[in-house]
Amino acid sequence: MMSTGFSWGTQALSESTEVNSGLGDLPTSIPRYTPNLKPVNNNHHSNGKKRRYSEDQESKVVKPTGNRKHYTTPSTYYKSKKSRTPKIMGQKLPINRLVEALDHTSLQRLLESLIHEHPEISNTIDKISPKPTLTDSIELIKQKFNSIMHHLPYKCDTESDYSYLRIKTHLNEFLNCLSDFILNFLPPIETNVFNSLKFLDEVTDLIHTLPNFSNSEFQYTKSMAYEQISNTWLIVLNHKMRPDDGTNNNNTSNTNEALSSSSSPSPVAQCNMENSAQLIKIIDELNLQQKLAKHDNMSIGKFKLVVEFVNSEIENYENFNHTVTNNGGILNDLITVDYSNFSIAARTSH
């Protein structure tokens, strides 16, 4: 039973096993006399040598000597393999990709938070930000207005106090936004009179369309809104820039001065007359005379001064054109000369 547990026995080992198999399970300490098994003992002696040789070979394979420098341990192999493979780790998005992924609302909140944390960048944003166009400005204010209408209760009187309380927050947001954009469309920030008047006409219509809540607070707020918008109409219509110093000048007084003067008008008066002609053209293009009359009727007389100013401008301009036409006819009569006396026949007759 010397080779129990091993699997690399030789043929001689098998023969020895067959011979010894008939001995039975006798104790190994009892000596026995077996004169006829000498060949078997020789085989057993040679088998022991083979087994020792196999164990020596196994020890050489499993336990290499320290002189073999080319042998690489598994840990060293893994380290060299790890150094050749780049380590891949997760990382955050670049700023440009992060901004691209944000929607309008998220980007707006991000900018507001950034300005809140760093107020010093407000001037920089104001300088590099593009100016909102007339169309975009009106569209934004209409969105604020639609927010009011969408939050009105369905099963309740539209003009009740309950309805007003439901939309009060959205109404304040609408009026605040309206106030900011009105100031942005006033001179000298906005130099295009057409854009200013077009904007004022659009927002005045929105004020008319607001539900007429019976709440006294709303009635006061609406009345104040009409008065402020009416004043901005007058500011834009009466804004005439002088070419010399850029200060405001009353166009009506200069028109009357030009009409009453028998001599040619001064350069300032002439410039104001040109501005007045441009204003009359814009009033005609926007049909403001009729629209302002409607605004005055809808606001119960809040635009009376604006209507009177526009009518006065139109009347003065028509009077000026009529005066220039008449003066031109008189001047033509004064310089008319009878050239018949200077004919060759008349000169020879003398």
From Swiss-Prot:
Region of interest (Disordered), ranges: 17-84, 244-269
A GO-annotated cellular component: nuclear membrane
Main subcellular localisation: cytoplasm
Keywords: Cytoplasm, Nucleus, Protein transport, Transport
GO molecular-function terms, A-Z: proteasome binding
Recorded coiled-coil stretches: none
Superkingdom of origin: Eukaryota
Subcellular location: Cytoplasm; Nucleus
Low complexity: compositionally biased ranges: 247-266
GO biological process: nuclear protein quality control by the ubiquitin-proteasome system; proteasome localization; protein transport
Purpose of the protein: Involved in ubiquitin-mediated protein degradation. Regulatory factor in the ubiquitin/proteasome pathway that controls the turnover of proteasome substrates. Targets proteasomes to the nucleus and facilitates the degradation of nuclear proteins.
Quaternary structure and interacting proteins, as annotated: Binds the proteasome.
Record-stated family: Belongs to the cut8/STS1 family.
The protein, known as: Tethering factor for nuclear proteasome STS1
UniProt gene name: STS1
